[in-house]
């Protein structure tokens, strides 16, 4: 009995909603003399902004989600990424930041060090591709460091420092000296008040990033 009442209520609610949407349309398309006409916005009508046009803070940078965590890994090919870079270029993006170079066992480039630690071999070298596309469309690329996943479980940042000291050197030697589009580094580690050793870890990783690259800009996750 209760299920039937609920179904009746939903049917009535749906009919009432449809009627509410249809009634204004029917009234709007019938004149006083019974003739029909189509409503359209006046060509002379325009929005009246109370602030100057093109006076806002322009967004010129964006993050590249390397899709190794929440979304199936590497589900775009280079054609899709190339088109995405074209769209970004057209709207004024000149800086792209890879959120992270890997998470746990999924990685974005064939790192000898991380493969030796049990990570999976990626199907494509996303880092190389991003750098080539950034160079093609005159953008700067920022490399996001590796996320071991251990500190999410333990809140201990020492894992990040240990792994990334090899990743930083490896990446700079492989890509940094090769591509002019390599613009800097991103320490992607997210922290909280429960994270152990965050200040020391950020200092150690950030200093190494700058030292190997001749002082390229290095920033941290907000």
Language model regions located:
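N-terminal export signals
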Residues: 2, 8-30
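C-terminal segment of N-terminal export signals and the immediately downstream linker at the start
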Residues: 25-52
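The substrate-binding groove and active-site-proximal loops of carbohydrate-active enzymes
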Residues: 65-75, 111-122, 153-162, 188-196
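Short, acidic/polar
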Residues: 74-88, 164-173
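Active-site groove signature of glycoside hydrolases
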Residues: 148, 170-197
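Extracellular glycoside hydrolase catalytic/binding regions
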Residues: 190-199, 206-222
């Amino acid at each position: 009995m209760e299920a039937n009442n609920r179904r009746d209520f939903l049917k009535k609610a749906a009919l009432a909603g449809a009627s509410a949407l249809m009634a204004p349309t029917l009234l709007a398309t019938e004149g006083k003399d019974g003739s029909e006409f189509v409503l359209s916005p006046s060509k002379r009508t325009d929005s009246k902004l109370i602030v100057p046009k093109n006076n806002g803070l322009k967004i010129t940078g964006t993050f590249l989600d390397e899709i190794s965590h929440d979304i199936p890994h590497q589900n775009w090919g280079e054609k899709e990424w190339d088109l995405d870079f074209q769209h970004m270029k057209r709207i004024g993006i000149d800086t792209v930041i890879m959120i992270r170079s890997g998470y746990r066992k999924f990685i974005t480039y064939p790192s000898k060090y991380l493969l030796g630690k049990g990570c999976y071999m990626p199907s494509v070298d996303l880092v190389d591709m991003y750098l080539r596309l950034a160079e093609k469309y005159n953008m700067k690329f920022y490399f996001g460091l590796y996320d071991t996943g251990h500190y999410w479980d333990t809140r201990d940042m020492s894992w990040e420092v240990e792994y990334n000291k090899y990743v930083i050197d490896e990446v700079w030697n492989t890509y940094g000296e090769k591509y002019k589009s390599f613009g800097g580094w991103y320490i992607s580690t997210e922290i909280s008040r429960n994270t152990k050793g965050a200040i020391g870890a950020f200092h150690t990783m950030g200093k190494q990033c700058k030292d190997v690259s001749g002082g390229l800009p290095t920033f941290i996750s907000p």
